[in-house]
Amino acid sequence: MALDPTKHADWEIAQDAEKDMLTIYEIGEKLGLTKEELLPQGHYIAKIDFRAVLARLKDKPDGKYIDVTAITPTPLGEGKSTSSMGLVQGLGKLGKSVCAAIRQPSGGPTMNIKGSAAGGGLAQCIPLTPFSLGFTGDINAIMNAHNLAMVALTSRMQHERNYTDEQLERLSGMKRIDIDPTRVEMGWIMDFCCQSLRNIIIGIDGVNGKSDGYMMKSKFGIAVSSEVMAILAVAKDLKDMRERMGKIVVAYTKKGKPVTTEDLQVAGAMTAWMVDALNPSLIQTLEGQPVLVHAGPFANIAIGQSSIIADRVGLKLADYHVTESGFGADIGFEKFWNLKCRFSGLKPDCAVIVATIRALKCHGGAPVPVPGKPMPEEYNTESVEWVEKGCANLLHHIRNVRKAGISPVVCINAFYSDTDAEIAKVRELSEAEGARVALSRHWEKGGDGAIEFAETVIEACEEETEFKFLYELDMPLKERIELIAKEVYGADGVDYSNEANASLARIQADPELAKLGMCMVKTHLSLSDNPSLKGVPTGWRLMIREVLTYGGAGFIVPVAGTISLMPGTGSNPAFKRVDVDCETGKVEGVF
């Protein structure tokens, strides 16, 4: 019998369930994989040979495609991964053939505030510790591939400074690129949250001692913000990945010409690091349903999706395939809608919007909960008024999903402190907006608590959809940014820094770059670019401070507000509570 989530930590529940979990071959058989298509990494984890699977099942119709998104979250998160696992377990209880695709957790949040992305309570994926701490090495491969590009760039700059054109040609066959050190687009990456590395100087002794590099400003981002990670999420196959890898813009020349990884002759070696990472990984839920894990970009600072490859595999193997978009529907679902589905050609049958009474109270005026601190008393006291006010945020997201032509299902992710009156108000307002609504207690009861949720999703999947994109790629860049800002976020308009205006003018003038997709970078804690503005802010304008070019991933990246591609570690990080049992080797405290 499963442990009680009101009395036991997530890691305790996971370790207890892991005593009886299915072997990877049993999970593979459940999903319909052959032994040859499984590439085991121990007894309970495997990579999947996606090429073999897709070739074998090329004529099989796809299953139903379900995206799980959420309302604008509090800093604590609203249980989107938990709800994804709960939905899969609920569908399993109904005897449905089901699969999930989720993102690999980053070491940064796992060791910081948010924790892992395995779900929680009785709706988790296992084995928890390897899933949370490095897993099958994909993020490590991404770091190596990305940082190799920076090695190629910085060493090239050093050699061009140290040698004449004739010496470069004689020593290595190089021709001078003449990179502008003030226009290096790329930085270094690591898989932790470290504010000290946001702005750095490298090559400090490289001015007089010419063997120590090229002294210049540089930066670190978190690994999941890397364009290499984005490429893993959107690549269709190895050939597509190799082509995309060569289009990464690392810098510009002094004449303003983009310098790519292909120009630096490093794209092939970068791809070599990524060959194994292109295969999705396979694990299971607490109740033995298959879960694919592939790619891990955040939605606030990146594309925020698990991979297209994982979705294609899941749709061929299962009748119901559940994927997940990061954070709220304004950023994660918007990118699923206008980027991932555009790249993949896949059309969703249903979108789930996860809502909690806690988040609705926060959007309705209750104090914002702070990770690591006691929950304000307002969240343990009934307040239908706060919930009703906060529902404005939920209704905004319902309308956005409807703009995509998809059937929305509101999942009320129940907490034991929620009251019947609060839940009834959410149901009333959501149904009045035309959404289906399900109350789910998967955190507390696992699949048994998600039956209504699963049945509602099945019903929604039978409804005809009229899926359509928000914008076409031939629309001018500024018009697209303003359309997203007004239609999805609710802004009055958009303002641009001088730097952003210059970048957009340069990109718009390039016929190839001007038709790339649009991947907005914005806080996840508000519909606006100001994380302190809750509910549905009015009378505000989106501020674009810079615009990046991700030519390999296939999109332009407008960066809004003050958000950073390298998060910081808080004052009460999760790593303080992680340790090992030296007798058993078991890791404790991961959540």
UniProtKB/Swiss-Prot annotation:
Coiled coil: none annotated. GO terms for biological process: tetrahydrofolate interconversion. Pfam families: FTHFS. It comes from the Bacteria. Pathway: One-carbon metabolism; tetrahydrofolate interconversion. InterPro entries: Formate_THF_ligase, Formate_THF_ligase_CS, P-loop_NTPase. The keyword ATP-binding applies. ATP binds at T74, P75, L76, G77, E78, G79, K80, S81. GO terms for molecular function: ATP binding; formate-tetrahydrofolate ligase activity. The keyword Ligase applies. Keywords: ATP-binding, Ligase, Nucleotide-binding, One-carbon metabolism. It is an enzyme of class 6 (ligase). It catalyses: (6S)-5,6,7,8-tetrahydrofolate + formate + ATP = (6R)-10-formyltetrahydrofolate + ADP + phosphate. Its EC number is 6.3.4.3. Belongs to the formate--tetrahydrofolate ligase family. This is Formate--tetrahydrofolate ligase.
